[in-house]
Amino acid sequence: MARGAGLVFFVGVWVVSCLAAAPRTSWKRVTSGEDVVLLPAPAERTRAHKLLWAAEPLDACGPLRPSWVALWPPRRVLETVVDAACMRAPEPLAIAYSPPFPAGDEGLYSELAWRDRVAVVNESLVIYGALETDSGLYTLSVVGLSDEARQVASVVLVVEPAPVPTPTPDDYDEEDDAGVTNARRSAFPPQPPPRRPPVAPPTHPRVIPEVSHVRGVTVHMETLEAILFAPGETFGTNVSIHAIAHDDGPYAMDVVWMRFDVPSSCADMRIYEACLYHPQLPECLSPADAPCAVSSWAYRLAVRSYAGCSRTTPPPRCFAEARMEPVPGLAWLASTVNLEFQHASPQHAGLYLCVVYVDDHIHAWGHMTISTAAQYRNAVVEQHLPQRQPEPVEPTRPHVRAPHPAPSARGPLRLGAVLGAALLLAALGLSAWACMTCWRRRSWRAVKSRASATGPTYIRVADSELYADWSSDSEGERDGSLWQDPPERPDSPSTNGSGFEILSPTAPSVYPHSEGRKSRRPLTTFGSGSPGRRHSQASYPSVLW
């Protein structure tokens, strides 16, 4: 059912106090079948007036769970929120006149009731034999002769079913001699359950159950469940945390604040306690009522960490460090674990969780709804896991044969992509091969040209005079000279040479300006570094071209 913000009915003193300036709303719980006395007339009132009792039934809204709400300036009241869709229109129940109102035939009447089992007794509303359908909001209004009607009191009546009596052994007969068992009911008529005295509301906020250990740390936390504010107010939370160590071991404590948005479509927010301890469960990650469920969280709004704590140095006396997300108008309240809202706006409204970790384990937690009156929603704590959101299933038509799947258009595209990739790789391979071939050719040419440029250069045509100094008339000597090293010359240069031969002309050269040059210069070899390998060119008879 879609629920809007305008379909939410608020029950509590904050509605009456802020909107109608009336006294607080009270709560009354009775058992089915009891006689209930509600809303006595106020003691201080004008003489001429009439009293009007009315009711707004809430029996179709399920169980009502009131919560303690703090108003600013500090004040605590019980309140709850119900969906207007489950409510029926207000109904007048009874009216009383003071002095009595004149009726026809010169008669007077002072009370008038429009419903069975309802009467006015001593200017109080009485419901005889209350039923579960009588649960609702009851109001009393006073109307003066010259004033408009004003509401002076209201009460939320919750009628619970009567407990079923359990049978006792006295209600049955023992087995007789024939083995026949005759059960008989008690002859006494059932007695109505004893009337319970009214229970006053607690004077302190609800205490979150703490974690107790024989060893380790016990944490106590106290907090209000809701704070209502008007836009522009500055206020702070009121969380009290006490850590008691049972041994001398050191420990670390983290106080973590988390915030959750409260959608206007939710009549209440459900906090699944099991998900606080196991937030990674599938039911907690995907609850069926995700918008209105608190089962997992993405980030921490504020963290105050205490390190090096012990029995003798409990928080906040141990080393503390605080971190907070940058939220305008939100800050730490001094050096405590509480938050301060400065010039609060509707954007600050939401459901806040305060969780205490001791050595990375949850030891205590509490929740708090901080909002304006128009944004307020109930916060209900559930002990069980939420229902998991069902997986989406594609709808199928029954008794209809599914058509053959059409050929996918992605097939040709994939084939074209594969062929294109193959052609591209082939082109890259050919290009690489061509580049390598060209590079190798250029390298070979460069080496060849370098070798030809550094080779020996001959400046004379070989003739018979070139070998005159080493020629011999004996054929045998000429033949043997091929296998012997030439003798060392006195004018030989140093053994460190380049290995090339310098040919000097010993006869008239074939080039100009060489006539008359009769000096015979020996052919000198600049040795390669080893005297044994140094030799002259004449040692090897050959023809130089």
From Swiss-Prot:
Q: Where is the composition biased (Basic and acidic residues)?
A: 475-491
Q: Where is this motif: Internalization motif?
A: 458-461, 467-470
| Positions glycosylated per UniProt | 122, 238
Modified sites of kind Phosphoserine: 471-472, 498
* Membrane-topology descriptor: Single-pass type I membrane protein; Single-pass membrane protein
Which positions, given as ranges, span the membrane?
A: 415-435
InterPro entries, alphabetically? Herpes_gE_N, Herpes_glycopE_Fc, Ig-like_dom_sf, Ig-like_fold
Q: Which residues lie on this side of the membrane: Virion surface?
A: 21-414
* Keyword hit for DNA damage: no
Annotated region Acidic: the residues are: 471-479
What segment(s) does the record annotate as region Interaction with VP22 and UL11? 465-490
Keywords for this entry? Disulfide bond, Glycoprotein, Host cell junction, Host cell membrane, Host endosome, Host Golgi apparatus, Host membrane, Host-virus interaction, Membrane, Phosphoprotein, Signal, Sulfation, Transmembrane, Transmembrane helix, Viral envelope protein, Viral immunoevasion, Virion
Query: What is the disulfide pattern of this chain?
Result: 266-292, 275-284, 309-318
Signal peptide (from-to) = 1-20
> PTMs?
Phosphorylated on serines within the acidic cluster. Phosphorylation determines whether endocytosed viral gE traffics to the trans-Golgi network or recycles to the cell membrane. N-glycosylated, and sulfated.
Q: Sulfotyrosine-modified residues are where?
A: 172
Feature: compositional bias, Pro residues: 189-204
Give the UniProt subcellular location, in the record's own words.
Virion membrane; Host cell membrane; Host cell junction; Host Golgi apparatus membrane
SUPFAM superfamilies, per database record: Immunoglobulin
Region annotation Interaction with gI: where it falls in the sequence: 61-86
**Topological region Intravirion:** 436-545
Job of this protein: In epithelial cells, the heterodimer gE/gI is required for the cell-to-cell spread of the virus, by sorting nascent virions to cell junctions. Once the virus reaches the cell junctions, virus particles can spread to adjacent cells extremely rapidly through interactions with cellular receptors that accumulate at these junctions. Implicated in basolateral spread in polarized cells. In neuronal cells, gE/gI is essential for the anterograde spread of the infection throughout the host nervous system. The heterodimer gE/gI serves as a receptor for the Fc part of host IgG. Dissociation of gE/gI from IgG occurs at acidic pH. May thus be involved in anti-HSV antibodies bipolar bridging, followed by intracellular endocytosis and degradation, thereby interfering with host IgG-mediated immune responses.
Query: What family is this?
Result: Belongs to the alphaherpesvirinae glycoprotein E family.
Oligomeric state and interaction partners are given as:
Interacts with gI; this interaction enhances the Fc receptor function of gE. The heterodimer gE/gI interacts with the Fc part of host IgG. Interacts (via C-terminus) with VP22 tegument protein; this interaction is necessary for the recruitment of VP22 to the Golgi and its packaging into virions. Interacts (via C-terminus) with UL11 tegument protein.
Q: What is this protein called?
A: Envelope glycoprotein E
What does the record give as the organism's lineage?
Viruses, Duplodnaviria, Heunggongvirae, Peploviricota, Herviviricetes
Which gene produces this protein? gE
